[in-house]
A protein has these predicted regions:
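Conserved PLP-binding active-site segment in aminotransferase class I/II-type PLP enzymes
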Residues: 1-81, 85, 129, 148, ...
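Structural detector of well-ordered beta-strand residues that form the stable sheet scaffold
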Residues: 66, 91, 112, 171-173, ...
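Conserved PLP-anchoring active-site segment centered on the Schiff-base-forming lysine
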Residues: 76-134
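Residue-level signal for well-ordered alpha-helical positions
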Residues: 81, 183, 225-228
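Active-site phosphate-binding strand-loop segment of PLP-dependent enzymes
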Residues: 119-208, 213-222
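Active-site C-terminal subdomain of aminotransferase-like
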Residues: 220-233
């Protein structure tokens, strides 16, 4: 007799029994805020900022958040804000969704894929450092950025990756699209690097059906990203 196989969904969106989602959709139409700006978006950014800035031990981080059209856009603008451009190289995790690497090529740069370690399935720190040294020897310059990923809510080796990044002066754009809500040593994933990427696609921990956000280290970085995202308005 064949066994019955039950589908286990990686992530399934849940609508509240109180229909709160419909309330806010109606509110947007009633107030004519149907553009991707306005009080609901501002409030969402503020709540995200409050969440990512609070460590589990009660201490605070100084973070800013920009809501964007997609997680891919967050990777794109994070790399752009790091100065990535034609002729540059960016170290990126090989085991990931293509949105982690496509923005690198959008900017005319070249991805340098780094394989994963067995424990976390995420970027192997030792292979990362070897790649950085190798690219410096072959091209005369270091990679312009590093993009580690938090797959399936699992943190990459944040301590070691950040140690290597700081050693060589390379900014980190942390792809926490699948890691929102998870913490490493009490700190929210996406808050370790210069920028952190969030996604609110339909298969993520919280969803707006589509959309994303970029966690920034300071108001200046947020202003720069907002300038890119809103056509310099």
């Amino acid at each position: 007799m064949d066994k019955e196989h039950k589908m286990i969904y990686l992530c399934l969106a849940h609508m509240s029994e109180e229909c709160m989602e419909q309330k806010y959709v109606k509110e947007a139409f009633d107030t004519n805020w149907v553009v991707p700006l306005g009080p609901n978006v501002n409030g969402f950014e503020d709540e995200l900022k409050a969440f990512v800035s609070k460590n589990s031990d009660g201490t605070d981080l100084q973070k800013e958040v920009v809501a964007l059209s997609a997680g891919t856009a967050a990777v794109h603008l994070g790399l752009l804000a790091c100065g990535v451009g034609p002729g540059d190289e960016v170290c990126v995790q090989s085991f990931t969704f293509c949105a982690s690497s496509h923005p690198i090529t959008y900017l005319g740069a070249t991805p340098v894929f780094i394989d994963s370690e067995a424990d976390s399935w995420n970027m192997d720190p030792e292979l990362l450092e070897k790649a950085i040294i190798d690219r410096k020897e072959k091209t005369g310059k270091y990679p312009k950025a590093i993009v580690p990923v938090d797959l399936y809510g699992m943190p990459y080796n944040c301590d070691r990756i950040m140690e290597i990044a700081n050693k060589y002066g390379i900014p980190v754009v942390e792809d926490a699209a699948e890691g929102f809500g998870s913490r490493y040593k009490g700190q929210v994933l996406g808050t370790f690097g210069k920028f952190g990427v969030l996604s609110f696609n339909g298969n993520k921990m919280i969803t707006t059906s589509g959309g994303g956000a970029l966690i920034c280290n300071d108001a200046e970085s947020k202003t720069q990203v907002m300038w890119y995202a809103t056509q310099a308005r």
